[in-house]
Amino acid sequence: MPAYDGWYARNMYDVNSHVYKHHVETYGPVTEFGFKDFIPMFKAEKFDPQAWARLFKEAGARYVVPVAEHHDGFALYNSTFNPWNSVKIGPKRDIVKELRAAILAEGLHFGLSSHRAENCWFFSEGMKIPSDVQDTTITLYGERIQEPDGPTLSREVVHQDGSNEHSRRDWLTHMYEIIDQYQPELLYFDWTVGKEPFQETFYKFMAYYYNNAIDWNKGVVVNTKFGYGDNIQVFDIERGKSDQIRPYPWQTDTSIGKVFWFHHKDESDLKSVNHLIDDLVDIVSKNGNLLLNVGPRADGTIPESQQKVLREIGHWLQVNGEAIYETRPWIKSGEGPNKGTAGYMTDSEQSVYTSKDIRFTTRKDILYATVLSWTDGFVTIESLSEDVKPVHSVSMLGCDEQ
């Protein structure tokens, strides 16, 4: 709702954060106006799931993964176990159900993202100061987990110690619920589920999900960031890429914004179309997929600036999608002086490529070479040496000449 900061719900309770200052100046003290008070203002009155699905298809997407619930604990679906949901409060609509129907109607694959596991600590900053978070009857704010000696549990400590038993049981109940209600083909998770204390619970979830998928006669995917082998889930790199071809399929999840995930009033930091296409090509050349985030407004519309970027990506894929969809890695991902950035949280700035930077993909006996910058009319592919199979013909996608 505030359209000011991605982790507004947490940082509005941190007295050392600029978000706290902004909140107090704009909405008043956190004792009187807490995060819960934004929810009735969230109406999604212009939300059109069919328009969203058409846009995503036009952008060239093959699968769509709405957020069922983020760290803040507000569910965008009809939950029996969480009264803080979009059917009972705010929009009075089952956002997930409506999107699922629209996405499937466009012939796209439907997944869900859940961050319920992070809710147990997300509002713990509010326990340090007088705030509505200290009212433990407000279940939206989760466990407010604290360290044994009193200080509020930080994100870094959560990385070390995980959650608690009650929050893990709570998480599992919610996962069973969205599996049963929506039958997603993909479930994406953030980092807490990868911590050792969470893993026993997560294995129970995976067994339930995979066994149900057999009954549905569907192939399903689980995305995690660490803690589990590539043979049981699909590895995900947040806002980053791999530096090599990975033997198993993997995924980059990133945002259309250089910094934001959620809607921000200042959209000057949108990534360029070229930036996103370069990343897509590099990711696919290394056996990966791209999950691209957009930040809608509270009224349910996707800003026109973001729509424009998506449509331009779609236009490029209409011509060049043959080198992307249903392809496999070649014997090497590419060549050229710029190997690109690798690792988590490394993609905010665009890599500077030259016409010597090329990425490879294959389909059957066809090798696709995508040049990451405009050339002077000539391209030299050094990887096609005499040791490689002979080249029978060369053509450019979108051009009938050879």
Annotated model-derived regions:
Residues 1-402:
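Mature catalytic domains of secreted/periplasmic carbohydrate-active enzymes
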